[in-house]
């Protein structure tokens, strides 16, 4: 049996975008830093990394649609933070953001990762943005690197 997988090294010519829903920016800024760190550590060049800012997580899917339809980027890492409050707003935003990102990803067939935190408390968000539970932005970008290489290997 042949095993096809992606490695964790970029050639340096890959163009990647980070789309950041900046609401809860104290958290999302840390996710962006983690994503940038992963991109550079795995061989990406800073001039090939773009940060696209949108107001919040709900706006990420439309920005993703615009980014992928432009053909300028090879992959996208989506980050944001939706924190549960006392109203159903959390449920609507997290569900529609997730569905929107998934639908756009399937439409274009390019590597897109979901680094949007959907958490019950600010404490959980802090843990996932570089504290006890690691940095989910770093993890999402590491998955971008792996998927870029996997998709190249599948085409070869």
UniProtKB/Swiss-Prot annotation:
One GO biological process term: riboflavin biosynthetic process
Residue positions binding (2S)-2-hydroxy-3-oxobutyl phosphate: 86-87, 128
GO molecular function: 6,7-dimethyl-8-ribityllumazine synthase activity
One GO CC annotation: riboflavin synthase complex
Residues binding 5-amino-6-(D-ribitylamino)uracil, per UniProt: 23, 57-59, 81-83, 114
Claim: Transferase is one of the keywords in the record: yes
Gene3D superfamilies found in the cross-reference section: Lumazine/riboflavin synthase
Enzyme Commission numbers on file: 2.5.1.78
InterPro entries, alphabetized: LS, LS/RS, LS/RS_sf
TM ranges: none
Family, as annotated: Belongs to the DMRL synthase family.
Name used for this protein in its record: 6,7-dimethyl-8-ribityllumazine synthase
Record organism: Campylobacter fetus subsp. fetus (strain 82-40)
Lineage: Bacteria, Pseudomonadati, Campylobacterota, Epsilonproteobacteria, Campylobacterales
């Amino acid at each position: 049996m042949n095993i096809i997988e992606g490695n964790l090294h970029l050639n340096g010519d890959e163009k990647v975008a980070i789309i950041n829903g900046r609401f809860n920016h104290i958290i999302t800024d840390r996710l962006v830093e983690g994503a940038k760190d992963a991109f550079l550590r795995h061989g990406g060049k800073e001039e090939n990394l773009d940060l696209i800012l949108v107001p919040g997580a709900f706006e990420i899917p439309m920005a993703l649609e615009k980014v992928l339809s432009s053909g300028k980027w090879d992959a996208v890492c989506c980050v944001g933070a939706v924190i549960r409050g006392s109203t159903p707003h959390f449920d609507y935003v997290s569900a529609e953001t997730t569905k929107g990102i998934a639908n756009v990803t399937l439409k274009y067939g390019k590597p897109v990762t979901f680094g949007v935190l959907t958490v019950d408390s600010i404490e959980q968000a802090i843990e996932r943005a570089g504290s006890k539970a690691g940095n989910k932005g770093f993890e999402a970008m590491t998955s971008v690197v792996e998927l870029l290489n996997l998709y190249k290997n599948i085409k070869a």
